[in-house]
Amino acid sequence: MLSLIIRRSRSRFIIHGIKISCNSLSAVDSSSSVLVSRRTFSSTPALSYFGFNYGKISNLNQRFGNYAYSGSSFASSTRSLSSEAVAVAATCDGLTVERIIANQWPILDENEGDWKSHAAAIAQSIQVIKRRLQWKKLLVRLKVLSAELNKSDLWDDPTHAGKISREHGSLTGKMKGVMTFERELLEHIDMLKLAKEENDSELESETLKALIDMRRVSKEKELEALLSADNDPCSCYIEVQAGAGGTESNDWAAMVMEMYKTWAQRRKFSVTVVDEAPGEIAGIKRATIKVNGEYAYGYAKAEVGVHRLVRISPFDSGKRRHTSFAAVAVIPILGDGSTRVEINDSDLRIERFRSGGAGGQHANTTDSAVRIVHIPTGITATCQNERSQHSNKASAMAVLQSRLDQLEMARQTAMNAQHTQSLTEISWGNQIRTYVLHPYRMVKDLRTNYEVSDPDSVLEGDLDGFILSFLSSSLDKDDPEH
């Protein structure tokens, strides 16, 4: 399958016996110049020009398949990905992403800019994405993995083979996505130039709209490129624990947990309450939720730390200003077969107790809640949200496994202090973000200095700005080219 722009041009060459001409690619028609849409062409010999179909553009969302072209050459999908990634994609007249950036076309607002402005914004995003993914290192790693996969004895060790295969597939997916996005930009530019030459206002309008849509998508792809660590694609547990301060801190902890539930739902993640210990008057002492979704951990890891609230207390009859703290921990849920720590039954102490809560006619009157203690480390996991003891035990074991895996990862990277069970004192010196509701209104991240003046939107789950700024700053610290 192949998609081509077919038009008249002075430079000609021959592919498989067919005369092709174009600054990109074109087929010669003896009677007139022919514009062929970005449709997908069949290679069935019975059709004229090996099945090349003619007509105006019908669907701008269809792509060029796996063909990358530069000047008078193109690479088919039969070439290796690494070779294709090294090749420089270009428009008919030799315009590349690098040249677009070098041209320094002004980047205006989406509603004000012309096609050059949109193209420059997208090209800039592609450059940022490649830098964040460390493109050259990916190419080297891909070659190493490809060599491993070609070894005849690879599957003598199925565990190792599976790991290599998964990593190769992950890298391939990332790189193909970027290359396809880059080619799509250049295709749109070719289409716009062609539409102008042919005075085709409809084609020009549709292509410009596609370019604007692509500009919006490019920002999402920039964010995705920040999530390149091994565990970033995982689902996760988010734990919130109230600091010292009684009812005031318990209420703040409940607000923080509700903020994460709303954030997760806005990102289309599924949320399940695993454990919750209610406060005596209001709020929660602690709570754990399970967030299921691709890259849930990659995003949520930016929230680890102590969150501070300054407000007029609704529980103080004197209407005085109070400061409250809540600690947040995020634990990745590794995929099946990826656990780092093997848990022996002899290392566990399992305690059963009656679930807490507000009571009433639906109060659980059986000892269905479960607390599991890992004796060697002292790490505990509790679940009381399920109705049966069996379900609570299974959920608690899953949480314990994830905590132990995280502890092992922290030990291996000399980062034990960041582990959820090693959280330092929940107080002034360890805060990452401050939420001020009085005497002024502001939320400020102390790590990146990113701030907003609308605390309500943040508490309603609008966290992406904080997450993006943290992930960007973390990457920039590790990036020698920055």
Swiss-Prot record:
Directs the termination of translation in response to the peptide chain termination codon UGA. Required for the proper translation, stability and normal processing of UGA-containing polycistronic transcripts in chloroplasts. One of its GO terms (molecular function) is translation release factor activity, codon specific. GO terms for cellular component: chloroplast stroma. Residues 1-21 form a transit peptide. Keywords: Chloroplast, Plastid, Protein biosynthesis, Transit peptide. This is Peptide chain release factor PrfB2, chloroplastic. It comes from the Eukaryota. The keyword Plastid applies. SMART domains: PCRF (SM00937). HAMAP family: Rel_fac_2.
